């Protein structure tokens, strides 16, 4: 990895007035890794899983050159990278989702993403946005530091050691999982923290877990640490906490929040939190716990070790937090699903390689009649089981778990339109189509277009309208500078769906049946949606084609997505127009010449 800036310490002293271009080089290649003790070939950035930490300062411009060296025929060999949470003002072409904002980068080609960061600060991450490729390892953390952070006097340490990348891990390449048509294969084999974990079924002949298999954060008594926690998973949710220590939440998804002290918090795929931990306990070793809470009984752990403890590093004396998933959830995931259908379009194809709907896209087709009869009953059982489990955890351990609805933005709290009605209201009803096994929004299952949405808009010589997009592109045009409210609800089947909107942080003005909150609602870019639904608001002040999708990657593969074409005429011309360079324009002509095996 190449970087043109000085040390993080020096960066923290540089005011935004001295913003610079921060260069990185990404060699995306296949390589063998064993983060949980089981070796497999993966998709790596600079030979690492997770990929290297990207850091910059407020006001800097990130310039990241991606060199595609992928060669393993069992995995996708083209690639794209999405910079999750970066708003991409006037740089929608750099956002990364294949066939929304770009064509993929072919093997043996390179592409440089250039992204002015503007006023953004906080905790973000990057991942492949081509098919299910990030499942195979292409994911890593991003931190944008603020030299004038309002909370700077509340912590002493905030560096690469305190960044925690939580990730589920699969032993089988994602393409092979899709080809099996078996939903059980979408359950991860293990979980990791900063690329370290354990795979421990009793029947497996794998490495025994040792201290070296666990990530270790060393702390000094009396010091305060800003922990930045990222859920870079394909499906897994975690409950994160540090044994014997409280942590004060100050950031959610890149948005500073008013402080909330908790013992633990739930974090869904795509979400991020910062919390301040004070090392105020007896010098010893303590568990950092992050059990997976939604798909399998797996304890994911790291260690917090006091440097003041003069004894050799050892396991904590106290037991670690265990998690018991309800039998109803286990039954949901282990129900016999049978074979999978598809929408009649190949998984690899010319100039449409988000991979969206093949293979897993109908993983529940054969169980349709059975599950449709049981859906309401099952969903109720799942929700009841989870609620009872949360109650038991809180009562037994007196654990204070973050209530997401209580998050308040530190700067400019309040919905964009205040309490007045939104200018545009968009009802979005999602669910599973039992006839074909596809997830839908408003009865449409997303399929990527033959030409990237952004390219379509930029080359349209007439006014962009709905007729420019096919039905299964599921593209909705939004007018500029309006307050938009999305009413998102549907048939969640007892699962919490992490919904992510590109190009915006939004205000969650209502959770389920709770009273609406326009005064100080939570603000973030990933929100969990259940049957009860949510309502979110944002202002259309960032022209571009922005993806809305479930961040359970397998659900995105099954069509749980749509695109908002925001202010399309302003994308083409004016002060907020998007102006891709020559290398971007050449991606599609290079990609469309590839044989299917190299896509």
From Swiss-Prot:
Q: Which residues are glycosylated?
A: 207-208, 231, 397, 443
Positions binding Cu cation 2 in this chain are 84, 127, 551
**Annotated Cu cation 1 binding sites:** 82, 500
Question: Where expressed (tissues)?
Answer: In mycelia, at a lower level than LCC4.
Cellular location of this protein? Secreted
Query: What's an example Gene Ontology biological process for this entry?
Result: lignin catabolic process
Give a GO molecular function annotation for the protein: hydroquinone:oxygen oxidoreductase activity
Q: Which UniProt keywords apply?
A: Copper, Disulfide bond, Glycoprotein, Lignin degradation, Metal-binding, Oxidoreductase, Repeat, Secreted, Signal
The record, for SUPFAM superfamilies, names: Cupredoxins
The entry assigns this protein to a family as follows: Belongs to the multicopper oxidase family.
Name assigned to this protein: Laccase-2
């Amino acid at each position: 990895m190449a970087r043109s800036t000085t040390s993080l310490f020096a960066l923290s002293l540089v005011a935004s007035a001295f913003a610079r271009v921060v260069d990185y080089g990404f060699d995306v290649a296949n390589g063998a890794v064993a983060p949980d003790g089981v070796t497999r070939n993966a998709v790596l950035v600079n030979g690492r899983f997770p990929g290297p930490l990207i850091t910059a300062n407020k006001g800097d411009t990130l310039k990241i050159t991606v060199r595609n060296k992928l060669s393993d025929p069992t995995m996708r060999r083209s690639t794209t990278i999405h910079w999750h949470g970066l708003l991409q003002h006037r740089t929608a072409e750099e956002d990364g989702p294949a066939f929304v904002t770009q064509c993929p980068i072919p093997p043996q080609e390179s592409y440089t993403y250039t992204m002015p960061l503007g006023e953004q600060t906080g905790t973000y991450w990057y991942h492949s946005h081509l098919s299910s490729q990030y499942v195979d390892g292409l994911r890593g953390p991003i931190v944008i530091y603020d030299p004038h952070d309002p909370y700077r006097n509340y912590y002493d340490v905030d560096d690469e050691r305190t960044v925690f990348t939580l990730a589920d891990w699969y032993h089988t390449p994602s393409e092979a999982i899709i080809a099996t048509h078996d939903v059980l294969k979408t359950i991860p084999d293990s979980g990791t923290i900063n690329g370290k974990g354990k795979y421990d079924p009793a029947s497996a002949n794998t490495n025994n877990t040792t201290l070296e298999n666990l990530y270790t954060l060393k702390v000094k008594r009396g010091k305060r640490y800003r922990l930045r926690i990222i859920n870079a998973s394909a499906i897994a949710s975690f409950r994160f906490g540090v044994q014997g220590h409280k942590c004060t939440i100050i950031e959610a998804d890149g948005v500073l929040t008013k402080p909330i002290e908790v013992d633990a918090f739930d974090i869904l795929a795509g979400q991020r939190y910062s919390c301040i931990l004070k090392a105020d306990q007896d010098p010893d070793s303590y568990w950092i716990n992050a059990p997976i809470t939604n798909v399998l009984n797996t304890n994911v752990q790291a260690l917090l070790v006091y440097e003041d403890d003069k004894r050799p590093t050892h396991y904590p004396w106290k037991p670690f937090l265990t998690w018991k998933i309800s039998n109803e959830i286990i039954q949901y995931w282990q129900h016999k699903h049978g074979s999978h259908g598809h929408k009649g379009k190949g998984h690899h194809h010319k100039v449409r390689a988000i991979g969206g709907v093949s293979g897993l896209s109908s993983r529940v087709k054969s169980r349709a009649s059975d599950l449709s009869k049981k859906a309401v009953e099952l969903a109720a059982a799942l929700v009841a089981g989870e609620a009872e489990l949360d109650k038991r955890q809180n009562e037994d351990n007196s654990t204070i778990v973050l209530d997401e609805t209580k998050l308040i933005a530190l700067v400019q709290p309040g919905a964009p339109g205040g309490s007045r009605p939104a200018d545009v209201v968009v009802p979005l009803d999602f669910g599973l189509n039992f006839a074909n096994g596809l997830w839908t929004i408003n009865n449409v299952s997303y399929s990527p277009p033959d030409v990237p949405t952004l390219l379509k808009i930029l080359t349209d010589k007439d006014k962009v309208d709905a007729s420019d997009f096919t039905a299964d592109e599921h593209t909705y045009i939004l007018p500029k500078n309006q307050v938009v409210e999305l009413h998102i609800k549907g048939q969640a089947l007892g699962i919490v769906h992490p919904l992510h909107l590109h190009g915006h942080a939004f205000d969650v003005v209502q959770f389920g049946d709770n009273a609406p909150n326009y005064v100080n609602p939570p603000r973030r870019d990933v929100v969990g949606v259940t049957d009860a639904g949510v309502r979110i608001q944002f202002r259309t002040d960032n022209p571009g084609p922005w993806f809305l999708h479930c961040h359970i990657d397998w659900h995105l593969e099954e069509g749980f997505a749509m695109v908002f074409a925001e202010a399309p005429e302003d994308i083409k011309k004016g002060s907020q127009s998007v102006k891709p360079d020559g290398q971007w324009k050449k991606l599609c002509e290079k990609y469309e010449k590839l044989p299917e095996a190299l896509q």
